[in-house]
C-alpha cells in the first residue's frame, strides 16, 4: 500500500502528534514491508497561505495560465496528486487554541478544489472525488476535550474530509499533553494502544481489531 503522511506541528521531533505518526509508521514497516511511505512536513516545508494570486492561478484554466500562475498552481497540483496516489492518508495534527494549525488550514485550502477534489452534481449537491482512501487522523491535544463542545476541530475536520470524499476516517487523539508529565505519558500510551488495535487491511478499511 501507498501511505501518505502529512505532519503539521511546529515542534518537529518534539511533537506529540509526530510521535503518534512515528508509532504508526513503525507498525506499518513490520506489517507492510512492501509498502511505500511519503511524508510531507507542513512546518518544515510550509504551504503558502492563500492570497489573490493563488486564487487567480487556480481559477484560471491550465491552458490560459501565464508563467507565474503555472508556478503557483504547480504546488497545489502536487498536493492533490499525492492524495489521489495514496491508498492510505495519515494526518498528524496538533490542536492550537481549540483549532487546527494555520499551516494545516492552508494545506486544506490548496487541496479543496472545485472540479478536482470535489464537484457539484446537476442537482447542486456536492460530491467528493477523493474516494476509496483509508484516513487516519492523529491528534495531539493539550487538554481533555474529546467529545465536548470545546472540541471544535474534530467536527470541522470530519465535515471537510467527507466533503472531499474521504469517509473511511478514524480519529485517535492523545489528550492531556499540557497537563503534566504523567498525564501526557498516559495520553500518549492510550493513543498508541488505539493505534495498535487498528485493523489496517486495505480491503476492510480502518476498524478496531
Swiss-Prot record:
One of its GO terms (molecular function) is oxidoreductase activity, acting on NAD(P)H, quinone or similar compound as acceptor. Binds 1 FMN per subunit. Keywords: Flavoprotein, FMN, NAD, Oxidoreductase. Its EC number is 1.6.5.-, 1.7.1.17. FMN binds at residues 9, 15-17. Its cofactor is FMN. HAMAP family: Azoreductase_type1. Belongs to the azoreductase type 1 family. Quinone reductase that provides resistance to thiol-specific stress caused by electrophilic quinones. This is FMN-dependent NADH:quinone oxidoreductase. It comes from Bordetella parapertussis (strain 12822 / ATCC BAA-587 / NCTC 13253).
Amino acid at each position: 500500500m501507498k501511505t501518505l503522511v502529512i505532519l503539521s506541528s511546529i515542534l518537529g521531533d518534539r511533537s506529540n502528534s509526530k510521535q503518534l505518526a512515528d508509532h504508526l509508521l513503525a507498525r506499518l514497516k513490520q506489517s507492510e514491508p512492501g509498502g511505500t511511505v511519503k511524508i510531507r512536513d507542513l512546518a518544515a516545508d510550509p504551504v503558502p497561505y492563500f492570497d489573490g494570486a493563488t486564487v487567480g492561478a487556480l481559477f484560471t484554466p491550465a491552458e490560459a495560465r501565464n508563467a507565474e500562475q503555472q508556478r503557483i498552481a504547480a504546488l497545489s497540483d502536487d498536493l492533490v496528486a499525492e492524495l489521489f496516489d495514496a491508498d492510505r492518508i495519515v494526518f498528524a495534527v496538533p490542536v492550537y487554541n481549540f483549532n487546527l494549525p494555520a499551516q494545516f488550514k492552508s494545506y486544506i485550502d490548496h487541496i479543496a478544489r472545485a472540479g478536482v477534489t470535489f464537484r457539484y452534481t446537476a442537482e447542486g449537491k456536492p460530491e467528493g472525488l477523493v474516494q476509496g482512501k483509508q484516513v487516519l487522523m492523529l491528534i495531539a491535544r493539550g487538554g481533555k476535550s474529546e467529545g465536548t463542545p470545546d472540541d471544535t476541530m474534530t467536527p470541522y475536520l470530519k465535515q471537510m474530509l467527507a466533503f472531499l470524499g474521504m469517509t473511511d476516517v478514524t480519529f485517535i487523539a492523545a489528550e492531556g499533553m499540557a497537563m503534566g508529565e504523567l498525564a501526557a505519558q498516559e495520553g500518549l500510551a492510550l493513543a498508541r494502544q488505539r493505534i495498535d488495535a487498528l485493523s489496517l487491511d486495505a480491503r476492510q478499511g480502518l476498524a478496531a481489531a
